[in-house]
Amino acid sequence: MGVVRVQHETKMENQSWLKKLARRLGPGHIVNLCFIVVLLFSTLLTWREVVVLEDAYISSQRNHLENVANALDKHLQYNVDKLIFLRNGMREALVAPLDFTSLRNAVTEFEQHRDEHAWQIELNRRRTLPVNGVSDALVSEGNLLSRENESLDNEITAALEVGYLLRLAHNSSSMVEQAVYVSRAGFYVSTLPTLFTRNVPTRYYGYVTQPWFIGHSQRENRHRAVRWFTSQPEHASNTEPQVTVSVPVDSNNYWYGVLGMSIPVRTMQQFLRNAIDKNLDGEYQLYDSKLRFLTSSNPDHPTGNIFDPRELALLAQAMEHDTRGGIRMDSRYVSWERLDHFDGVLVRVHTLSEGVRGDFGSISIALTLLWALFTSMLLLSWYVIRRMVSNMYVLQSSLQWQAWHDTLTRLYNRGALFEKACPLAKLCHTHQHPFSVIQVDLDHFKAINDRFGHQAGDRVLSHAAGLISSSLRAQDIAGRVGGEEFCVILPGANLTQAAEVAERIRLKLNEKEMLIAKSTTIRISASLGVSSSEETGDYDFEQLQSLADRRLYLAKQAGRNRVFASDNA
């Protein structure tokens, strides 16, 4: 309890210090300080304009980049969603294959041709895609390949079902050039037809040696998540670069194969060009996760990379800490944003010459005129505002003091005391601190008024108020709530501590005689009632005051000039 009291007293002292500081720094000083700050900042006008313009410029660059990145991301997300849909369909077909005669015949046909060097199973060329495969002997030569699974027949029928879905999902408006399912059991289904059966082994081994297939082994892809891979063409090769999104197909902890979709870089380049506002400057570049250049929106530099190794290193360092951002490189501003559904980053490059031709010159002039107008108005109005604020503050302070205080005793009046007490009670309740109330009533005050007059009574009230105030702690609050009644609020004080304060008040009032007329002195006394929230857990100020008032009258009935802190004391 001692620690709680110390903490509470420290908090009260801090609040008192803040109030003193607020009184010392009156509105007049604050107005002067504001104008001084304005004058100081006027010397930094040019710098401030640069900062404002730079923030607006960076926001503009990021917004343009975000629009293009979102458009590209949505298109890529559509392809990823299709891939997940195909995987779910494949899993369902592996667990519960359709019991069609044509599918059973396909399994029989596989058993008949599985030893052949190359084979092809086709149900209906118009509705589904053929399954192309190689022999058992060729499968046994691959480290990742195997036909040793109990659900091989189900996988054959599932591949035919997925072939039907692949044909439906593949369309010319999509960026995807090829969608394929490659099985570890030596066969594949692809939207790109294999015209000659003799080409099946070459094409199959081309698939299973690709990073997008090998990278989905259970060791390489433990989380069995979607992955993106980039393939760069070799020198003297006619193939074009492309990115492949792929996902493993597993069932019952067995890896069956990989579903993949290949997107040529040229289609992504065309998409970037179509997504960009023709009225905007700047070049967009797409990079993979290793910051290898893929494509650009600039038709004049379709395969160029405008960053040297040092700049790429700076860009990579900046990307380590956030998913989006910007960096200034010489006369260029480079903004970047990682894509959600592609393992790569979209970069926007804006040069200084492009920025000069933009709208920021007009913005600079507008900001300058606005600042000049605002400063002129401040300087012209300063004197009038300063005088008005000073006069209003003096008047407000006087009216506020009169509204909150009793002019005779200079203590809080009843309304102000209640306004102060309720928030303090709520604060003590919140922090589980005790909250106590002392009710004070001067004994035989009416007799003093009747015998010595109202002026003497006023002097007694003023004298008693001074003694009560001098008996309190710094955080305590006292107020006059009636004719000769006073109320003291003690936040953080328990019943015992409040009773000690009440006894101190009683002794001070009773031990000093006061002069009320020429050669006439009297000794006054008071009856006091004490209540505390720790008795019943009730922090309602009015209830506590009522309880203290009841105990006050118990003290009067017991003979006056005493303190009652309980109903039995």
UniProtKB/Swiss-Prot annotation:
Q: Which cofactor does it need?
A: Mg(2+)
InterPro entries cross-referenced by the UniProt entry: CHASE7, Diguanylate_Cyclase, GGDEF_dom, Nucleotide_cyclase, Rev_trsase/Diguanyl_cyclase
> Which residues hold substrate?
449, 454, 458
Residue ranges of domain GGDEF in the record: 433-568
Q: What is this protein called?
A: Probable diguanylate cyclase DgcQ
Q: What is its main location?
A: membrane
Q: What does the record list as GO biological process?
A: cell adhesion involved in single-species biofilm formation; cellulose biosynthetic process; negative regulation of bacterial-type flagellum-dependent cell motility
Q: What does this protein do?
A: Catalyzes the synthesis of cyclic-di-GMP (c-di-GMP) via the condensation of 2 GTP molecules. Cyclic-di-GMP is a second messenger which controls cell surface-associated traits in bacteria. Involved in the regulation of cellulose production.
Q: Where are the transmembrane segments?
A: 25-45, 365-385
A family per Pfam: CHASE7
Task: Quote the EC number.
Answer: 2.7.7.65
State the Gene Ontology terms under molecular function: diguanylate cyclase activity; GTP binding; metal ion binding
Q: Which GO terms describe its cellular component?
A: plasma membrane
